Structure formats: C-alpha cells, structure tokens
C-alpha cells in the first residue's frame, strides 16, 4: 500500500512515499559517450541528418536486447541562434514524422500540421530554428499500435553566455513494459503480461561522479510516454533552474524531489558536497513504489574548489515575454480526457477544423477541463505557456509546454501568440494503453 502524504525523512528511510495523486498534486504545484549526428556547419547554418530506424538496446544484463525505434543514441548539441538544415530519413516499416518537443516557432517543420508523416524509405528536408537555449527532446512521431517503443533523443541548445557549472549531464528517464522474451510493448497497447522497467540513459543504475564542491547541472527528462514520475536526490540541496527548456527563477525542490509529466524536462543545479566517497542516492517513484535508479558520488579527486559555489543566479533568459496582458486575451476552452474532436496521428488531416485560431501578437487563455477518469497530459506545440492562478490574477513563475491535469480538474494557461503558423496540440491519458490524440491550432 502506498502511503499518501509527504516524503519519508531521508534519515529514516531510503525510500520516499507518493501516491499517483501525490504525483499529480506535486506536478500542479511545481508543475555518455555522445554519438553525434552527421552535421556540416556554415555561417550559422548546420546541416543535420537524422534517421528514424530500428535499433536494439540492452536493458537487462543477462537478457536479450530489446528492439526499439529511435533517432540514434547520444545527445544532440547545438547553440542558440543556429538554423538546422535537417534531412530526415524514415527507415522504419511505418510512416513517421520528426517531433522536436519544446522548439517554439517552427511552423514549417511542424509534424502533421505542416509536414505529413513520411512513408517508409522516404526522406524529407526542412529547417529548424533554435530560438531558445534549453533542454528539448526529439523522437519519431508515430501512430499508436506500432510494434516497438520509441527511444527519444535529447536535444540540448546551449546559450551564448557561459553558465558557471563544472559538469552538464543529461539524465533521460525511460519506462519500458517488458515481456518475458525481452521485447517491449509500445504505448497505446495493453501492457498485459509485462513488467514495468525504468532506465536512466539506458541503464538500470546510473552513476554520476564529480570532485568535492563541484557544481553539476543535471537535465532530467521524463522520456516515459504515459507516466508521471518523481525523482528524488537524497540529502542534496536541489535547485530548480529551468523547466521545459525555459529558465525559471531558481527555487529549491521540495524534499529534493522533482515531479515530471511525460515528455517534460527540469534542469537543476546540485553541488557535490562532502568528503570523497560520499554517495547520494537517486530514487524514482512511479506513483506505486520508489526504487533506486542511480547515485551521485563524490570522487577521490582533489576538491575542485575550497567550498561550494554560492547559490546560483537565474540562467540567462530566452527573451520570453515579460508580461501577459490578459485583459484583452482571446479565450478558448479545450476538453481533455475525451476523444471527441481529437484524432489519432494516423487519422489526422490538416483539413480538420482547428481547435482555435488566434491573432498574432495577442495573448491567449486556454481553459483546460479534464472530463476523463484519469489524469491527462496536454502538450502545446509552437509556444510555451504560463500556468495561471485560480483567479487569473497571476501565474506560476515558470514557463511550460507540457501540463498534466487531474480528472475533473480545470486549469487555465496563457501564452502570447508570437509565431504565425499551424501547430499541434497533443493529449495523452496517463494509462499505457491509451492512444495519443492530436488537434491543431493556428496563429494568423
């Protein structure tokens, strides 16, 4: 039985207790050997070749490798302001589109709304403009019911100003539903006769090592397709620096825990404080139980400095709107938890009526009501949004592109319609067998 309440004291237990409702409540409140893609750079433009392909990864030490559909391994790293000339090839047996989550203002590259799914064996070329620095995520966008799960690939865009950290580490958390034969059930299918399995960067136990007093930037990504997850770094001061790729006013993570909706990202700073050999467990909670998935270890190297850095200032900004004047905002309602007027990706047609149309330069307020029986996750393409307070008299001090909404709950979000074009809206229920559903909106 999972206890509903606060996390257990680190001194009392190596575990922390959360229910599924705890995860959702916390989310609402807070809301490496690199393998590089083929790239050629010239005058701020970079040619990038990405292939959606069948791959295999070893999830169990003594078990068979698991087939996955991926864009390759390792982080994709570029600089803010670059324009990527992307060649996307589909080597999968089904149609696919490239979905890069969190990249605002790229309407010509928008999957489904602007670019149809690519047939097996075909190629497509388009541009991606990297307007913002931050942590993003790329994956093939498929219809549910595929024969293998998707293995996403982190996209890291660095800023033009240096950030005072000694290590910059990506931690991609993935959830698998493994059959006894080692194959994995993709989301959108009944996970019967399977075992939930979690990895960080493809490993069941992931270690990060750093000298004493080193400052680390840890970029946590929830690569699970359906589950809200909590990650806890025990006995560490965890400072949240960015959410969903956008800098936030730094704040301490409550009890050292982060709650991540499917596809969401949170960047934190931690200091490797303590003598050599000190170990800080990394725990993962899926709403049912907590399990250790890694640790941060203070290495035997000499301390990198006599004492840890003082608290960090905010990360350099991405020129997001300083204010949103909601008095003249366009207001729309969007129902979640129901398939009405939503489409599976394979059934989506750009000729379908948009969920809403907004005028460029005008603020937009969306009222989201979850009419389903379980939590539903909304992903807004093209623009980041603010989560509004209950009375629309303010907003949370961070930007989001992904939001989980509890059953029966209503949330309001607001954004400035900056980038003309057509963009997707996604919703997924937090159930492995639930389909991904999409609609679109336009900015004119």
Q: Where are the model-predicted features located?
A:
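Extended terminal and domain-junction accessory segments
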Residues: 36, 41-53, 147-178, 248-375, ...
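Short tyrosine-centred short linear motifs in exposed loops/low-complexity segments
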Residues: 81-82, 122, 130-136, 213-214, ...
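Asparagine-centered strand-capping/turn motif at beta-strand->loop junctions
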Residues: 88-92, 221-222, 368-372
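Hydrophobic or amphipathic alpha-helical targeting/insertion segments
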Residues: 130-158
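Active/binding-pocket-proximal capping segment
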Residues: 235-247, 371-398, 430-434, 440-444
